[in-house]
């Protein structure tokens, strides 16, 4: 997957996160759980863009680490939202799967970058 393709994929992930948060019921609990999901989920794409513009290999690795953390955090909030029954599992299943796939891609990229950084 190219950098540009991953930029587009993380952007679309952010858009889907926004729609998922908008689908939450209008309750205090949903608002409290939706805000960090919105922040983490949309920052995946923003931080990946920053990583793509990194000035050094070390900077790239550090910024990808932030992408990894934000993606994992978004997955956590989605799991919690399903667990407390604010949204049905089916509503978030493909979004959770996308978070897992993006996380795997980012982790693999970090490992590859670290190996080539040491050489």
Question: What are these model-derived regions, one by one?
Answer:
Residues 1-119:
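Short, C-terminally biased terminal segments at protein or domain edges
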């Amino acid at each position: 997957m190219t950098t540009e393709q991953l930029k587009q994929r993380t952007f679309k992930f952010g858009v889907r996160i926004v729609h998922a948060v908008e689908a939450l019921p209008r309750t205090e609990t949903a608002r409290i759980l939706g805000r960090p999901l919105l922040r983490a989920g949309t920052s995946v794409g923003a931080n990946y863009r920053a990583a793509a513009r990194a000035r050094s290999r070390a900077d790239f690795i550090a910024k990808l680490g932030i992408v990894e953390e934000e993606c994992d955090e978004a997955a956590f909030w989605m799991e919690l939202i399903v667990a407390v029954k604010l949204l049905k599992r089916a509503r978030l299943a493909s979004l959770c799967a996308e978070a897992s796939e993006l996380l795997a891609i980012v982790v693999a990229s970090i490992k590859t970058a670290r190996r080539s950084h040491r050489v």
